[in-house]
Regions:
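Nucleotide-activated chemistry modules centered on ATP-dependent adenylation/adenylyltransferase
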Residues: 1-18, 24-252
Length: 252
């Protein structure tokens, strides 16, 4: 079990970034971060700023992007009311890297297993650009820790990728494309049931009501009868997204 409270202190002022796709796993990590911050004394939690980034590819399925916007609205309201050191950042691909510019303008074929050009251009680059444009925060080269919702209980391919980047004896693992960055996997040992039980729980860390309970009920409905899994926050261009589930782009 990853101890986020301990890691928060151990990692000093190194910024944390949670990549929010809107799916169940990244939602769980986002909530886990918020609960962790609330459990820390104010003078400890203020040692670093955490970022929640969400990349809108501009071809997300309408029900999905509507849900993401609702969750982000609730998240922003909560962190503002609780004065938590969290900044929510919404990102989009550069115009010249959008789906239709590449498909129609450049004549690219629709993404396929052997040529999934969309992953790097539409998911990875916007976040990389955000980090590079803010060197005063992240440094150059950037020193940052990504909190990802990858789980060993996921697909075989994802499990293999996690194993390849695992640092034995540490909860901070290597990043696929950014050598100076690290990856923290707060829910790596959770089962799918663990994830759902967590995001749909009614209780919150302070004994109150889960502020995301209602919006997560809608998330559960989105998943109903859908393919398991969602497009994760990709940090390795060789990894495939999961077109076919409700959390893939509608174009695939």
């Amino acid at each position: 079990m990853v101890d986020l409270r301990a890691l928060f202190s151990e990692t000093g002022d190194i910024p944390w970034i949670v990549g929010l796709s809107g799916g169940k796993d990244s939602t769980a990590v986002t909530m886990n971060l918020i609960e962790t911050l609330e459990s820390l004394p104010p003078h400890i939690r203020r040692r670093k700023t955490c970022y929640v980034t969400c990349v809108n590819t501009l071809v997300e399925a309408p029900p999905v992007i509507d849900h993401v916007h609702r969750f982000i609205d609730e998240l922003r309201k909560y962190i503002r009311d609780r004065e938590l050191p969290v900044v929510v950042v919404e990102l989009t691909p550069d115009v010249e890297q959008t789906f239709w510019v590449n498909l129609i303008g450049r004549g690219y074929p629709t993404p396929v297993r052997e040529f999934r050009w969309c992953t790097d251009r539409m998911k990875i680059r916007p976040q990389t650009r955000f980090i590079k444009e803010n060197t005063e925060i992240f440094g150059d080269p950037p020193v940052v820790h990504f909190l990802l919702g990858t789980r060993f209980d996921g697909s075989h391919a994802r499990k293999k990728t996690m194993q390849n980047h695992t640092r034995i004896g540490s909860d901070i693992h290597s990043h696929g494309t950014m050598p100076s960055a690290g990856v923290i996997r707060p829910i790596e040992d959770w089962s799918t049931d663990d994830v759902w039980n967590y995001i749909l729980k009614e209780e919150w860390a302070d004994g109150g009501t889960n502020p995301f309970y209602e919006v997560n009920q809608d998330l559960a409905i989105l998943y109903k009868d859908a393919a398991s899994g969602e497009c994760p926050v990709i940090h390795d261009p060789t990894k495939q997204t999961c077109a076919g589930s409700r959390f893939g782009c509608w174009t695939c």
